[in-house]
Regions:
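Interfacial helix-loop-helix linkers and transmembrane-helix boundary segments
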Residues: 62, 82-97, 122-124, 150-152, ...
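Structural signal for the N-terminal portions of transmembrane helices
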Residues: 213-214, 285-292, 352-374
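Structural signature of hydrophobic alpha-helical transmembrane segments
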Residues: 61-73, 122-136, 159, 177-190, ...
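Predominantly late transmembrane helices and immediately cytosolic-facing juxtamembrane segments
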Residues: 2-12, 29-32, 45, 171, ...
Length: 398
């Protein structure tokens, strides 16, 4: 019985977040233990791969960031395409408020970071780091501490998190793609074009899209373009309505197949190679630098201010509305949960900042995310208790 309960928990969003947290804590413990040398030798070890005229040699950390994380971006793209075209956020009225809040939730942390980093000792390059929201942690926490709050809150948070993912992908593509190799890019585009043609067939071959994705990502690694952009483009090529020979929707089949690997392999492994910070190897003053404060305050203050402020403003202007049945207190709790950055914040940290600043800033991401998680969970748990005391109804909705 205990074993079946554990397995059931691990299949939920809180379970996925729990596994990723364990991976990050394990990395932090190893990096500050006698086994630190083995840990850093592992993540820095080079892995050469060559196919025909293309050859690339990257560290394990880089392969996880540029290779495995492409699977995460593919999964996010598939989810976005389905939810917008056929799912819970296909209605324009439902899209308005969370999309506006998602945009403001990226602007808010960026502004806080830039304000903190103006002047001596600041580094303006890290403004993208506190902008994303970690969907697994945020949705998992909502489901764990407040499962009986209005379902519209979850839909709002899901839409906002997906919009954040798209915004992060756009930032990565625009800001962090350098030194383009046109031959590899042209070949990647050619493979993508073939995938689009196959998508028009009545019964597209399932394996062709898998092979196409692998080829596009491999070529993109050689091209200088971020693999996140390539993975997202591959997701857009997968048809929503076309079915494989067994009658199953290709897009839904890929979603179901990828989800456990993303939740329990890709994201935990990314957390493991990213969160290993040797605390003793960095001067104490670095832990209180402007970039560190900018990221921590961006997540804990900028995110909720941007999200909550935009929902309030859009409701006042009648261009959007808060989730149906939810109170402003519950909206505040969700806005606080949006300050959990984690996976994509780690990803952007590795792209935006020099190596000597990354350990301190990654620790700031962990601290800011933990504080946001605790604050949001406390507010939502309190609201859940209040509703339960009133028999599920909130007759004094604020």
């Amino acid at each position: 019985m205990a074993r079946s309960s554990t397995l059931a928990f691990l299949k939920t969003e809180p379970g996925a977040g729990f596994v990723m947290t364990l991976a990050a804590l394990a990395a932090l413990a190893l990096a500050n233990s006698p086994a630190a040398g083995l840990y850093f030798d592992f993540i820095d070890g080079r892995v050469p791969v060559g196919v025909g005229p293309f050859f690339v040699s990257l560290s394990v950390e880089a392969w996880v960031r540029d290779g495995l994380m492409a699977v995460f971006f593919l999964s996010a793209g598939l989810e976005l395409k389905y939810e917008v075209l056929r799912g819970e956020i296909s209605s324009p009225r439902r899209l308005a408020a969370p999309l506006l809040a998602g945009a403001a939730g990226m602007v808010g942390p960026a502004v806080i970071y830039l304000l903190v980093n103006l002047g001596p000792g600041g580094d303006l390059r890290g403004w993208t780091v506190p902008t994303p929201t970690d969907a697994a942690f945020a949705l998992g926490s909502l489901a764990l501490v407040a499962p009986r709050l209005p379902r519209a809150l979850r839909l709002f948070l899901l839409t906002l998190a997906v919009a954040d993912d798209v915004g992060a992908i756009a930032l990565i593509g625009v800001l962090y793609s350098h030194g383009i190799h046109w031959r590899a890019l042209a070949l990647a585009l050619a493979v993508l074009a073939v995938m689009l043609l196959l998508a028009r067939r009545r019964r597209p071959p399932r394996l062709a899209f898998i092979a196409g994705f692998v080829l596009v990502v491999a070529l993109t690694i050689n091209s200088g373009i971020s693999t996140s952009v390539a993975a997202f483009a591959c997701a857009m090529a997968v048809p929503v309505d076309r079915r494989s020979r067994d009658g199953e929707s290709l897009l839904r089949a890929y979603q179901a197949a990828l989800q456990p690997y993303v939740a329990y392999l890709v994201l935990p492994l990314f957390a493991f190679v990213s969160a290993g910070i040797a605390l003793s190897a960095h001067p104490p003053g670095g832990w209180f630098s402007r970039p560190v404060w900018g990221v921590a305050l961006g997540l804990t203050l900028g995110k909720p201010l941007g999200v909550f402020g935009m929902v309030f403003l859009s409701s006042a202007l009648k261009i959007g509305r808060k989730p149906m049945g939810a109170t402003w207190s519950e909206m505040l709790g969700v806005a606080l949960l949006c300050g959990v950055g984690f996976d994509l914040s780690f990803f952007l940290c590795g792209l935006a900042l020099p190596a000597d600043q990354q350990p301190q800033v990654r620790l700031a991401v962990m601290a800011g995310s933990a504080l946001s998680l605790a604050a949001g969970s406390a507010v939502l748990a309190r609201r859940q208790w209040v509703r339960d005391q009133r028999g599920g109804a909130d007759v004094f909705a604020d």
